[in-house]
Regions:
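Binding-site signature for planar aromatic cofactors or substrates
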Residues: 1-125
Length: 125
């Protein structure tokens, strides 16, 4: 796991709308979802609430690598790539439950463990 750069942390606070969370199946076929129930955990990981994962959950269970893509209000794109951890209890799960709307089930918390961070085509770390 790498440390998220301050530029990305600041951009996260200025993101506009949903993120795109992409995983891959065993054959390498990508699956992308929009996610709005997301958070930045201790400035280390992007957490996505599992409210209605289907293919995404199967991919995570099969060890998929993943990426998160988001844009800021001024239209700047950021992408984080890495491994995915999945939490059904513990501090990451508790963090997700604090902000996930009660109307959604919040079955678990997918946590993207960053290995590379980009702003557009520029590698930040």
């Amino acid at each position: 796991m790498i440390q998220l750069p301050q530029e990305l942390i600041k951009a996260w606070d200025e993101r506009d709308g949903a993120i795109v969370f992409t995983t891959t199946d065993a054959d390498g076929t990508p699956n992308s979802i929009y996610a709005t129930c997301v958070g930045l955990y201790e400035e280390e990981m992007i957490v996505i609430a599992n409210n209605y994962f289907d293919k995404t959950m199967k991919n995570i269970q099969n060890g998929s690598r993943a990426s998160v893509l988001f844009i800021t209000k001024d239209g700047k794109a950021y992408q984080i790539k890495g491994q995915v951890g999945y939490h059904m209890r513990g501090p990451v799960y508790d963090f997700m439950k604090k902000w996930n709307p009660e109307k959604h089930p919040g079955h678990g918390a997918a946590a993207l463990i960053p290995e590379a961070v980009y702003s557009g085509s520029e590698k930040l770390s």
